Amino acid sequence: MVVLGSTGSIGKNALKIAKKFGVEIEALSCGKNIALINEQIKVFKPKKVAILDPSDLNNLEPLGAEVFVGLDGIDAMIEECVSNLVLNAIVGVAGLKASFKSLQRNKKLALANKESLVSAGNLLDISQITPVDSEHFGLWALLQNKTLKPKSLIISASGGAFRDTPLELIAIQNAQNALKHPNWSMGSKITIDSASMVNKLFEILETYWLFGTSLKIDALIERSSIVHALVEFEDNSIIVHLASADMQLPISYAIDPKLASLNASIKPLDLYALNAIKFEPISMERYTLWRYKDLLLENPKLGVVLNASNEVAMEKFLNQEIAFGGLIQTISQALELYAKKSFKLSSLDEVLELDKEVRERFENVAGV
């Protein structure tokens, strides 16, 4: 298999599962963590390696592997790979072209890069995609019973770092505080996306493209992250998916469903140790971006705008140029502005063009 983004949280877990399942690693890619990819090269001996920045070439120790550089280099590497499976764990819209290239080459795509579906779900062949995500894995597991007819799909949210912060203090929070996730250990972008509820907006759009544009889709807060998904059926019964908060479960099924079903990759749940599972609505007062959920489901192509404005605001937030309120404000302004416009988005180029336009427009907007 090919692992793109091998030095991140998902990538490291994927390599752990691949080793356990005896899956050969044909190719690896990383962003800036050259020290770690050098270690991974020693262990997994890939035939091909891609890095983002040519200035890192001097520090790379490829041990005979063919080396590719930049996003175009990743595309070229995928083109040459013979593996049937590509796991795309690149962060941000940077992973979009790699998803397209993998599907063009008729490869199965294990997709951890949320931005691919969020920005271009209408252009991707969903039949070749397995989402690497605890919520969508939960929905997939619940929908295996074909006798029951689903009516609504519900995913859970932890509430993120500011779920108990006094409302009047949320806007002034900094990145350091946003990175204190109560349940999961993840990369910085997804942890902040969890605090802003952007991550759940992403997952709502992913659910729309993956499981059905005709079903009701919603989310709720379940603080323990033990409940990942719920499906309500036409008979008004609801089935719930519970599992430990561990990404190795969805990753293992994306790599090899048969082996995953026979080998436990996560700790069993101790049902007696569970606190009372409690569901809470997502408060629009606390998570102001949640008010755009219905707008995004009505016009899912706005996902490009959501993602581009979020990435621009995220960079400023991490660089301490704006506080949390500024991040929220940037995304709100972008969605309000583009909700009034119409756009086709019938090709990858058109998606990337709109992405660029949104970035340029909001790059220089002063935040709170």
Curated annotation (Swiss-Prot):
Keywords, in A-Z order: Isoprene biosynthesis, Manganese, Metal-binding, NADP, Oxidoreductase
GO biological process: isopentenyl diphosphate biosynthetic process, methylerythritol 4-phosphate pathway involved in terpenoid biosynthetic process
Species annotation: Helicobacter pylori (strain HPAG1)
Catalytic activity: 2-C-methyl-D-erythritol 4-phosphate + NADP(+) = 1-deoxy-D-xylulose 5-phosphate + NADPH + H(+)
Pathway given in the UniProt record: Isoprenoid biosynthesis; isopentenyl diphosphate biosynthesis via DXP pathway; isopentenyl diphosphate from 1-deoxy-D-xylulose 5-phosphate: step 1/6
E.C. number: 1.1.1.267
SS bond partners: none
Protein name: 1-deoxy-D-xylulose 5-phosphate reductoisomerase
Residues that hold NADPH according to the record: T7, G8, S9, I10, G31, K32, N33, N113, E115, G187
Ranges in a coiled coil: none
Gene Ontology MF terms: 1-deoxy-D-xylulose-5-phosphate reductoisomerase activity; manganese ion binding; NADPH binding
Gene responsible for this protein: dxr
Function: Catalyzes the NADPH-dependent rearrangement and reduction of 1-deoxy-D-xylulose-5-phosphate (DXP) to 2-C-methyl-D-erythritol 4-phosphate (MEP).
Protein family (similarity comment): Belongs to the DXR family.
Cofactor requirements of the protein: Mg(2+); Mn(2+)
InterPro entries xref list: DXP_reductoisomerase, DXP_reductoisomerase_C, DXP_reductoisomerase_N, DXPR_C, DXPR_C_sf, NAD(P)-bd_dom_sf
Record-listed Mn(2+) binding positions: D133, E135, E203
Residues holding 1-deoxy-D-xylulose 5-phosphate: K114, S134, E135, S158, H181, S194, N199, K200, E203
Gene3D superfamilies: 1.10.1740.10, NAD(P)-binding Rossmann-like Domain
Pfam (any one): DXP_redisom_C
